Amino acid sequence: MSGKARASRKKPQQVKRSLKQRANKEADLPENEVGNTAKRNRSHAKHLSSKVTGQATYVHLKRVKISSSKRTTWQPLPKDTEEYLQSMMESVILGILFNIKRKEEIQCHLNQLKKRLLQQCATLKVPPRKLNYLKDVSKMLKMEKAQERANEESLASLQEEIDKIVETTESMTESIQSLKNKIQILTSEVEEEEQEVKQVFHIDSNKVLALPELSQKSLKAPILQEEILALIPNQNALLKDLDVLHDSAPVKNVSAFIEEAYKKLDS
C-alpha cells in the first residue's frame, strides 16, 4: 500500500515539472512557434489532467494578433480609467484588511502592488474608445440635472419644514417657561394669602376656625316677625286678609308671570 501511495504522489509532481519546463522553453521562442507549442501543450495538458485528476475543465485565453499599423493609433490609458482602477484597488485592499488583525505588512505589500500596477498602466497603450456611448450623454445630462433640481427643491422644502418645527418648538418652550413662572408666582401668592387667612381667622393646625362663642342673649332674642306683629293691634284679622290675598287670582297670575319671566331669563 505504501509503494502505491508514493507512486501516486510522484505522478502529479512530475506533471507539474514538465509543464513548467515547457512554459520556460516557450518564453524563449518566437510568436509563431509559441502558438504551435501552445496548441500542443493544451492537448497534452488535457490528456494529462484526465489521467491524473479525471478533470479536463480549463479556461484558456485566446491570443489575438494585432498588426503594427493598428498599434500606431493606440493611445495611453485614459485618466478616468486609471482613477477608476485606483479606487477599485483601494476598496479591494480595504475589504481584504477589514478582518485581519496584524495588517501592517500586508497593507504595505498590497500598496506596493497597487503602485506597480498603476505605473504599468501609466505607460500602457490601448485602442481608442468607441464613441457610441456619447450619443446619449446629453439626454443623460438633462435627466441628471432634472434630478438634481428635484433633489434641491425637496431639500429646500425639508429645510423650511425643519425651520418651522424649530420655531414652533422654541415658542412652545418659551410659553412653557412663562407658564412655569406664572405658576410659581401664583403658588407664592396663594401661600401668602393662606398665611393671612390663618392670621385673620385664627386657624389652628387642625384647620379649625377659632371663632368666638355666641351669647345666650342672641339665641333667646325674639324673631323679627313676632316683633312686627306685636306692633299691630288686630293680628288675627291681618293674617286672614293676607291669606285671602295670597289665594286670590290676580296674585296667582302675577306669581305665574314672574316664574315664567325667571324661566326665560335662565334659558
UniProtKB/Swiss-Prot annotation:
Family matches, as Pfam families: CENP-Q (PF13094)
Coiled coil: 100-202
Comp. bias (Basic residues): 1-22, 39-49
Tagged with keyword Manganese: no
InterPro entries in the cross-refs: CAD_CENP-Q
Modified residues (Phosphoserine): S49
Repeat in keyword set: no
Location within or outside the cell: Nucleus; Chromosome, Centromere
Keyword annotations of the record: Centromere, Chromosome, Coiled coil, Nucleus, Phosphoprotein
GO cellular component terms listed in the entry, alphabetical order: actin cytoskeleton; inner kinetochore; nucleoplasm; nucleus
GO BP term, example: metaphase chromosome alignment
Chain intervals for the UniProt region annotation (Disordered): 1-54
PTM comment text: Phosphorylation at Ser-49 is essential for CENPE recruitment to kinetochores and orderly chromosome congression.
Homology family: Belongs to the CENP-Q/OKP1 family.
The protein's role, per its UniProt record: Component of the CENPA-CAD (nucleosome distal) complex, a complex recruited to centromeres which is involved in assembly of kinetochore proteins, mitotic progression and chromosome segregation. May be involved in incorporation of newly synthesized CENPA into centromeres via its interaction with the CENPA-NAC complex. Plays an important role in chromosome congression and in the recruitment of CENP-O complex (which comprises CENPO, CENPP, CENPQ and CENPU), CENPE and PLK1 to the kinetochores.
Description of how the protein assembles with itself and partners: Component of the CENPA-CAD complex, composed of CENPI, CENPK, CENPL, CENPO, CENPP, CENPQ, CENPR and CENPS. The CENPA-CAD complex interacts with the CENPA-NAC complex, at least composed of CENPA, CENPC, CENPH, CENPM, CENPN, CENPT and CENPU.
Protein name: Centromere protein Q
Species of provenance: Mus musculus
